[in-house]
Amino acid sequence: MKFSKFFAPTLKEAPKDAILPSHVFLIRAGFIEQLGSGLYNFLPLGEMVIEKIKAVIKDEMDKTGALQVNFSFVTPSEFWQESGRYNVYGKELLRIKDRKENGFVLSPTNEESSVKMIANKITSYKQLPIHIYQINTKFRDEARPRFGLLRGREFIMKDGYSFHANMEDLKREFDVMEKTYTNIFSRLGLNFRAVEADSGAIGGSGSKEFMVLAQNGEDDILVCESCKYAANIEAAVRVKREAPCAAPETEKMQKFHTPNMKTIDDVANFFKVDKFFTVKAVIKKAVFVDKSEIVLFFVRGDDELQETKALNACGALEFEDASEDEIKKAGLIAGFCGPAGLPDDINFYIDKELKNERNLIVGANEKDYHIVGFAVTNFKDERFVDLSQVRAGDCCPKCGAKLDIKKGIEVGHIFQLGQKYSKAMNAIFLDENGKAVPFFMGCYGIGVSRLLAVMIEAGHDEKGCIWNTQTAPFKLEIIISNSKDEDASNFAIQLYEKCKNAGISTLLDDRKERFGVKMNDFELIGFPFAVLVGKGLKDGNVELIERKGLNKKIVSSGEIFETLKGILC
């Protein structure tokens, strides 16, 4: 391709709301353009990268025997009502109606569509397993679209759905997909981790996220360098913490007057104890499909409540801040809540690490009073759940080594859905005994357009993008420093034809632009290599530039083609 015939409009400045490097450079370098909030066009350079990503995904998926399909982007509302997700999904699900008042949704995901495609067509265990996937446009009505392609409203996604006769076969496919996704992201040249994760709105039991490690990552990941355990902070677990010092001695449980001491710091300082021996009460207003209510969560005083764990514990859609009036109406006294003596209608949960702990300080459920010497016993087992947020320095649940926190960006997620959707939608098959059984399902997603941004978050410098050879729109750019130099132009064209015939994707910058403009565009767009054909040609030399590090090397004009073949073929 010749640059003079190509469409790659570059900009000197990025939009003011572009903060992350990927957002800034993808717009400035002419890969994408913004249409509206969370909406983007892909220009030729961007589309070329997207197609390369799709090709890698398709190649690896097809190797597993998965079959490519294409679901309608617009899905009848009754599919989502049948699965039970129509109201649960919330405002991110864009609901529309046609001229006949028929309801539809713009699909953010396609579990329902996949069930409809398979149900009543696959009827026997003999036809299982089957795995279908698509690479298609999705829409999620984000409340605050930001960070360019990392948090847009319209996006491209690969989503796959597998159907099985039993849980064992689903787990087998889950492991196959973990290996397949590992192959995909490795081929794309990414530094990533597969981590334990929360299933979120998709549901199901086991799930893993694939996180690319990046300084500007939106997620915190707990990692163990000793055994390679890794988990999203929403799902991370730890070895039960040990007391940092001896517990305060108390002969019996007593109530103490603690005027205006509403915080853990106040209480710990008053009793001169480590916060480890106090219990923190966190009051939340939990929102459900048909109601909202006050829920209490208890964790150690020096721990923080992990909100996703808390949502999963009580089954709420989301939390809202409870007003003072709502707290009082519920019969609670903020700052002095404890697990014993709560109003009968208050739902509460206790972090499992507190089970059977003794000599703790808790709220007395009475204004200006705390209880010392409290024992967390005599509570039903269902009250105890994992609620604490794991942090750096906590001990790995697999090997006991210290955990560290890294930043990551999610690029893929795989789920064991089990029978959640097949039961809800009455999608059944006949098993070996002739019994009607709901399918066991798996779900497997990759953020295709998000990967475009992730690659730049992981590969850029202050000048622009740095593409690797696996995903670059062109592996090589040949730059004619002066388009009026006939010898340089002729040599560059000959080299361009040789590279093209050798299968090296090459862009010839033959534009009648100043040399500085051409170099700035090369550094901004970020092709892996460039050959500069300029004044040195008179001495039989050209300059080979590697975009990563902008390392330059003088190469004989007679040897440059073989050098390029050695690097890029």
UniProtKB/Swiss-Prot annotation:
For this protein, the record's PROSITE patterns field holds:
AA_TRNA_LIGASE_II (PS50862)
Family to which the UniProt record says this protein belongs: Belongs to the class-II aminoacyl-tRNA synthetase family. ProS type 1 subfamily.
A single cellular component GO annotation:
cytosol
Q: What does this protein do?
A: Catalyzes the attachment of proline to tRNA(Pro) in a two-step reaction: proline is first activated by ATP to form Pro-AMP and then transferred to the acceptor end of tRNA(Pro). As ProRS can inadvertently accommodate and process non-cognate amino acids such as alanine and cysteine, to avoid such errors it has two additional distinct editing activities against alanine. One activity is designated as 'pretransfer' editing and involves the tRNA(Pro)-independent hydrolysis of activated Ala-AMP.
Species: Campylobacter hominis (strain ATCC BAA-381 / DSM 21671 / CCUG 45161 / LMG 19568 / NCTC 13146 / CH001A)
- Output one GO MF annotation: aminoacyl-tRNA deacylase activity
**Database matches in CDD domains:** ProRS-INS, ProRS_anticodon_short, ProRS_core_prok
What is the protein named?
Proline--tRNA ligase
Record keywords, A-Z: Aminoacyl-tRNA synthetase, ATP-binding, Cytoplasm, Ligase, Nucleotide-binding, Protein biosynthesis
Q: Where in the cell is it found?
A: Cytoplasm
